[in-house]
Amino acid sequence: MLSSRAQAARTAADKALQRFLRTGAAVRYKVMKNWGVIGGIAAALAAGIYVIWGPITERKKRRKGLVPGLVNLGNTCFMNSLLQGLSACPAFVKWLEEFTTQYSRDQQGPHTHQCLSLTLLSLLKALSCQEVTEEEVLDASCLLDVLRMYRWQISSFEEQDAHELFHVITSSLEDERDRQPRVTHLFDVHSLEQQSEMAPRQVTCHTRGSPHPTTNPWKSQHPFHGRLSSNMVCKHCEHQSPVRFDTFDSLSLSIPAATWGHPLTLDHCLHHFISSESVRDVVCDNCTKIEAKGTQNGEKVEHQRTTFVKQLKLGKLPQCLCIHLQRLSWSSQGTPLKRHEHVQFNEFLMMDFYKYRLLGHKPSQHGPKATESPGSALGVQDTQAAPKPGLSQPAAPKTQFFMNGACSPSLLPALPSPMAFPLPVAPDYSSSMYLFRLMAVVVHHGDMHSGHFVTYRRSPPSAKNPLSTSNQWLWISDDTVRKASLQEVLSSSAYLLFYERVLSRVQQQGREYRSEE
């Protein structure tokens, strides 16, 4: 029921309307014309106030415990997801900060162009909450402008790939590093005249030949840089060819064929990556020498061709490990298809089995031996505990390395693997020498022609303990950020996995033992 004041106002309004209707047509026209003029003036004033002072609403501030999102500039979710993943790797952000400092110091004169390293560092520090900002959404268009300067063409109307952008960034950073002045050749008289005179004690030697190639410190320190080792062994004489090392910035793993009812794990992909293959019709110098020794009167012996076994391993593991799961396949008709199989992965990754070791080389025995039970916690730098393993452990020593992707029963169902080696449900991480921790996961939703990239990443550490690692996970889709659980992360169909190396319990005890000596 209306109050007495409301009823009085309604009665007065009805009387005013009746008086207006009883007036003549000319009077009503003048009144309505004046109202139109007044309304137009009010609208103009409102528009002017909006232009000068902006909207009256306040800017939304970021909620506590979350990170800034990134605005989608038009099919730029691939870039936003990769930036969120890189910002969750503290070792890469720290290296990039040191790299930009050294690059700025080594450059002669002012910068004539915008540097990729400085632009990338500013974005990653803002996304990892290392810079003071309360904005909920950031703009990464500056990175696109810099990449176009590096002659990387990108269209807002085409779908792009996050893994391709990862290699564009790493190669562009390498090009930026190569711009620094190198050792001047003695025949380059013009450059020598421009250099300042050196003190006598700085001159160590002179040479007539070309200078020896110097090692690139950038490559040796880059956190994503690793080396693959490959060697070939003759099946006939068992002669081993020299080991060859090739560099990599990410491991691109193909997904093996799945068996119905059996889950695929990250170990299956890694084992398929390093599995040996036979190479036929290869000239073996050792077999040729053996055959030549058995001949008489120095008869010429043809080159002996045999079958070699090629073995691939990881010669050097990086500090930050990027794993790319190849989800592109081709049908029998030649059309591209996306593989949607779920590949199980763990929060911790053991790479001991896939590491290349020299013949006769044994792991270091310094420090006390591990006396903990299989359920001992990880001795990582932030004292975070590792998952507790189960009661049973595999008896064979080699089986302990195939543990990546066998999650806890509370997270994922433990089913028998389609390969010959067993996968324990809960591995023992305490004795691993090459242990990595999951930092971010990039997921692609959709098919090969269209889709969307999202990222799962760890929340930045608190200001009170900046060296720690947060257990809180975040789900990020461009400018949308929310909290997520570890179970949701491990259940996702990963496209890119970002791991960072940590110390196991045995390594931590060995470091403490050596410091006490």
From Swiss-Prot:
Topology feature Cytoplasmic, residues: 57-517
Catalytic activity entry: Thiol-dependent hydrolysis of ester, thioester, amide, peptide and isopeptide bonds formed by the C-terminal Gly of ubiquitin (a 76-residue protein attached to proteins as an intracellular targeting signal)
Principal location listed in the UniProt entry: mitochondrion
Span list, region Disordered: 364-395
Localization annotation: Mitochondrion outer membrane
Regulation: Inhibited by the diterpenoid derivative 15-oxospiramilactone (S3).
PROSITE patterns: USP_1, USP_2, USP_3
InterPro entries the UniProt entry points to: Papain-like_cys_pep_sf, Peptidase_C19, Peptidase_C19_UCH, USP_CS, USP_dom
Record-annotated USP domain positions: 68-502
Gene Ontology biological-process entries: autophagy of mitochondrion; mitochondrial fusion; negative regulation of mitophagy; protein deubiquitination; protein K11-linked deubiquitination; protein K6-linked deubiquitination; proteolysis; regulation of protein stability
One Pfam family per UniProt: UCH
PTM summary: Ubiquitinated by parkin (PRKN) at Lys-235 and Lys-289, leading to its degradation.
Gene Ontology MF terms in the entry: cysteine-type deubiquitinase activity; cysteine-type endopeptidase activity
A GO cellular component entry from the record: mitochondrion
Mitochondrial intermembrane side: 1-35
Documented EC number(s): 3.4.19.12
Active-site annotation: C77, H452
Keywords: Hydrolase, Isopeptide bond, Membrane, Mitochondrion, Mitochondrion outer membrane, Protease, Thiol protease, Transmembrane, Transmembrane helix, Ubl conjugation, Ubl conjugation pathway
Transmembrane segments: 36-56
UniProt cross-link Glycyl lysine isopeptide (Lys-Gly) (interchain with G-Cter in ubiquitin), position: K235, K289
Function: Deubiquitinating enzyme tethered to the mitochondrial outer membrane that acts as a key inhibitor of mitophagy by counteracting the action of parkin (PRKN): hydrolyzes ubiquitin attached by parkin on target proteins, such as RHOT1/MIRO1 and TOMM20, thereby blocking parkin's ability to drive mitophagy. Preferentially cleaves 'Lys-6'- and 'Lys-11'-linked polyubiquitin chains, 2 types of linkage that participate in mitophagic signaling. Does not cleave efficiently polyubiquitin phosphorylated at 'Ser-65'.
Family of this protein: Belongs to the peptidase C19 family.
Protein's recorded name: Ubiquitin carboxyl-terminal hydrolase 30
Organism expressing this protein natively: Rattus norvegicus
